[in-house]
Amino acid sequence: LSPCIWVHVSQPDRFRAAELLCIYLKEKLRTEFLITYGEEFTKKPISLYDFLIVGKISDQLSHPNFFKDYDPQVIICLDGPLPYLLTSRIKQNKYFSIFADVRSKNLSNRKLKILPNFRKTVFNNFDFVFTENEMTASQLFQSSVDEHKIKGMGLLQSSIAPLPFSENDVTFSNL
């Protein structure tokens, strides 16, 4: 299964969106997909399609040959939280990475005491970030995420198509 596109789903309510994303991309890219899931899942999800679901992310990342065996070209994460080992791999910039469906609850509220207006964020480690809605995109802009990385609306549970930004909001006119 090497090379492949790795899709990680943190929350059970985003699993169907992950499958829809894989179906859409498989038609366009003609590649294989590997799906992992987060600690929030109480049991292994069952795919309605022919995708390889390898298991919980913590089990896979603890396996020393995981990245050698699968060698993903792209890592797509749907929602959070993300395990440290995954974010450290993404931070190394070895893989093209996308964070889709960022929700407000994923954003850190911690402020550094030295720089009170700066919020440390993992989202700068990703190549692209798609947010759940305009409010979340605005929060990312305010929390020091590189402007060119925020690309628009993310996936909805029921739809694969990204939603456009509001034309009335001048904050997003430069995207």
Segments from the language model and where they lie:
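Nucleotide-sugar donor-binding and catalytic loop/hinge architecture
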Residues: 1-4, 165-175
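Active-site and donor-binding regions of nucleotide-sugar-utilizing enzymes
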Residues: 3-165
